[in-house]
Amino acid sequence: MSPLLRFRKLSSFSEDTINPKPKQSATVEKPKRRRSGRCSCVDSCCWLIGYLCTAWWLLLFLYHSVPVPAMLQAPESPGTRLSRDGVKAFHPVILVPGIVTGGLELWEGRPCAEGLFRKRLWGASFSEILRRPLCWLEHLSLDSETGLDPSGIRVRAVPGLVAADYFAPCYFAWAVLIENLAKIGYEGKNLHMASYDWRLSFHNTEVRDQSLSRLKSKIELMYATNGFKKVVVVPHSMGAIYFLHFLKWVETPLPDGGGGGGPGWCAKHIKSVVNIGPAFLGVPKAVSNLLSAEGKDIAYARSLAPGLLDSELLKLQTLEHLMRMSHSWDSIVSLLPKGGEAIWGDLDSHAEEGLNCIYSKRKSSQLSLSNLHKQNYSLKPVSRVKEPAKYGRIVSFGKRASELPSSQLSTLNVKELSRVDGNSNDSTSCGEFWSEYNEMSRESIVKVAENTAYTATTVLDLLRFIAPKMMRRAEAHFSHGIADDLDDPKYGHYKYWSNPLETKLPEAPEMEMYCLYGVGIPTERSYIYKLATSSGKCKSSIPFRIDGSLDGDDVCLKGGTRFADGDESVPVISAGFMCAKGWRGKTRFNPSGMDTFLREYKHKPPGSLLESRGTESGAHVDIMGNVGLIEDVLRIAAGASGQEIGGDRIYSDVMRMSERISIKL
């Protein structure tokens, strides 16, 4: 039986192979062609991946085996060079970050923040902004009444050196300085980052987190465990006024709300305070942030692409949400200009008077958005404003208000205006959003902006009028004036301690105070505003905006923003005045006559891609990668005095500007 079956199977196979049917043949060939097409697509992808991998490995091989020309090699780091020269770690070092650069992580949150426990909401990839923007805004905002945590939310500062080494991936803040300190012998036992929640008022960092007490204990511990060597403190930006607050707090008795260290605590524990980019007297950009959630970059973007950030676009109300969040941060109020018209100028005069605009057309490329704006110059109608600039007018409403003599300006008293009437803007038509602007009558808004200009003194009245709740809360923690009599008991209150014009440096004649900052970059000094108009169905909750269509004959007026010399964020007058004059020698602000030193770093853009953001940059954050500044900090930490590193080094007109400022010393 089985031989018969094998014979039949063999016969059928032979028939099919010898006499194949045409129809069957056709059906067999078509799938083969389709399979061939699919395989060729996969093969192409595989070949492409192979080419890329081969090229990558070839480049790696060349990188490791072929000598790199000297001109393409990264320069030797200051830490390596100083270590070779015998410079070694000596004084313990405390780093104090400023606003924004410190990381914040979530410890408790709403259901929308599920999965984010102990993950960074600030100071990382910022991917959560795109994934859940409203949830992100809610968790970074503080309570509008207390300035502390909202109920059910706990966001805290990231501890340790990682708190502010990088602001975002590949964007260093303190990392380069930390690495260079390590090269001369620093490590965890003698190097510390004093992180704190930079959103809070300085007093509230102690109330909620005991940040000041922790800093005091850390300084005492590092002093005791490092051979009783005094500590070198290196604050940056707002960290400078935060540490100024600490200097007063630590010696104030415990019953008066201080740290109880006693009058000699600073003299015993601190060798020097090396302030980097200090915002001692505030920054004008804090005004524009609180007034309209804007700065020069946003104004430029609006002039290039009108409507991009307006409420009409996708109904996002981006700036409205950012303004509501920033209005809950008391720390921003600490950065408002201090000293009033005596420091920043009045309607007709200012400290920079008589100084020509130092930036030529050619140098305007330093402002990236400004350069972009120039490329579209012929496409945009631009109004021209003639110099001389009136920098004392921190905010001017309209071109005429920025030019007219003060006698021709409106004499409006903001304090006499009513905020609310029957036509108040109590709702918007683009989703639920509320700000303090919603309580203002349209009549009041128009009067505020009608042919008026505001100085550093009157702009505070303007902010009190448009955001009374925010200013009442924040001004319980900060003051922005000049003390008449520093011995007046009222200056024992903590709200004066972060203002160098309303507090004294400690009695520590051997201490040194440094002001290190960049110069040669256009820095925001004053603004020209206009009333915002809404052409679409959405009605903006922010009635004012910088007039981005206004340009001057030089780069000192660009996009409605006037620029002066500085480090791109802090004008020279704010960073340098106290070391140049306010604390120079024995003054009422520096009763023990501790030495002060000015060290300026002239900005030089990066010369190659290998320099990243520049080894000679003077920009506000990038300066912490400046080789000259790093060398100065390392030498001070290793025991050098201000005279031994070269004393003052000045490129700007800070001394001349300081001479023009007349205050009681």
From Swiss-Prot:
Topology relative to the membrane: Single-pass membrane protein
Annotated compartments: Membrane
Domain of life: Eukaryota
GO cellular-component term (any): membrane
SUPFAM superfamilies linked to this entry: alpha/beta-Hydrolases (SSF53474)
Family, similarity comment: Belongs to the AB hydrolase superfamily. Lipase family.
The name this protein goes by in its record: Putative phospholipid:diacylglycerol acyltransferase 2
Catalytic activities: a glycerophospholipid + a 1,2-diacyl-sn-glycerol = a monoacylglycerophospholipid + a triacyl-sn-glycerol
UniProt GO molecular function: O-acyltransferase activity; phospholipid:diacylglycerol acyltransferase activity
Keyword Transferase found: yes
Protein keywords: Acyltransferase, Glycerol metabolism, Lipid biosynthesis, Lipid metabolism, Membrane, Transferase, Transmembrane, Transmembrane helix
Gene: PDAT2
Catalytic-site annotation from UniProt: S237 (acyl-ester intermediate), D567 (charge relay system), H620 (charge relay system)
GO biological process: glycerol metabolic process; lipid metabolic process
TM region positions: 48-68
EC code: 2.3.1.158
